[in-house]
Regions:
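N-terminal secretory signal peptides that target proteins for export/translocation
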Residues: 1-16
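Bacterial N-terminal signal peptides
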Residues: 13, 17, 21-38
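N-terminal leader/targeting segments and the immediate start of mature chains
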Residues: 34-78, 230-239
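Gly/Pro-enriched, hydrophobic low-complexity segments
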Residues: 45, 125, 149-239
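N-terminal mature ectodomain segment of secretory-pathway/periplasmic proteins
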Residues: 55-111
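A generic structural motif
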Residues: 65-71, 98-100, 117-119, 171-173, ...
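An acidic-aromatic
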Residues: 86-138, 208
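Short, solvent-exposed helix-to-loop capping segments enriched in aromatics
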Residues: 135-149
Length: 239
């Protein structure tokens, strides 16, 4: 194995690990957290916004910018990387991330399979969603029917309003998962709350902040929008 092949393989593993962590975070924060929140106290502004968002927005589309900051190593400063693209979702269980800069990458959950495609490496990784979620609190989120079921595994709290946004936090009670906490912020619009910021802190010390703009509530998607077919010639991995 030459150095280029080794470096490419290492890069592929790092990208897959990062994209999988992002997928789990999105299943937590966008597709699942709002299930059964009808009993949220009226004074909890961030939770109220989440409840209304989940009740009203069955589908959505937005542009996003993501900044991922890795913890600083001894003697070094923290490293950050920025990416951007288009995000779409259709509850329950389907979403699409089209990364356009700096690399073309696609992350698709079709309700059965989680697909991760790296155009630069011409590589596809396919995982069954149920297996991916099986060892995480997201498995409970996507099947919970009421707030009581969610409270068995998560602590929900409203955060103070900041910069004109309503904030809430969800913290897993289990200490062995990949996600330490999720912060979500909503912006008031004439069509109801719009998802504005998603901040994820993982167990590796990595912090991901996604800022959403040009949000559209309940757009109509084609039947094939969340389907994925590996490009001809792409390597397909099914770990």
């Amino acid at each position: 194995m030459n150095a280029h092949t080794f470096a490419s393989g290492r890069m592929a593993k790092l990208r897959q690990k990062w994209m999988l962590a992002l997928a789990l975070a999105l299943m937590h924060a966008v597709l699942g957290l709002g299930l059964g929140l009808g009993g949220v106290p009226a004074h909890a502004n961030g939770l109220d916004s989440l409840e209304q968002f989940m009740r009203q927005a069955k589908t959505g589309r937005a542009q996003f910018t993501q900044v991922v900051t890795a913890p600083a190593k001894p003697g070094q400063t923290a490293r950050s990387k920025t990416s951007s693209g288009i995000f779409e979702f259709d509850r329950p269980g389907r979403f699409l991330f089209n990364y356009q800069k700096p690399f073309v990458q696609t992350l698709v959950a079709d309700g059965q399979t989680l697909w991760m495609y790296d155009a630069d490496l011409n590589q596809v990784t396919a995982r069954k969603q149920a297996q991916v979620l099986g060892s995480t609190p997201a498995a409970i989120l996507t099947s919970a029917n009421d707030l009581k079921a969610l409270q068995a595994d998560f602590v929900f709290q409203a955060e103070p309003d900041k910069e004109g946004l309503q904030w809430m936090r969800a913290t897993p009670k289990a200490k062995d998962g990949q996600i330490q906490s999720v912060l979500a912020a909503f912006r008031d619009t004439d069509k109801g709350p719009a998802l504005a910021v998603l901040e994820v802190q993982d167990s590796f010390g990595q912090r991901s902040v996604l800022t959403f703009t040009a949000y559209e509530s309940n757009p109509a998607f084609s039947a094939t929008n969340f389907q994925f077919k590996p490009p001809p010639g792409a390597d397909v991995l099914r770990p």
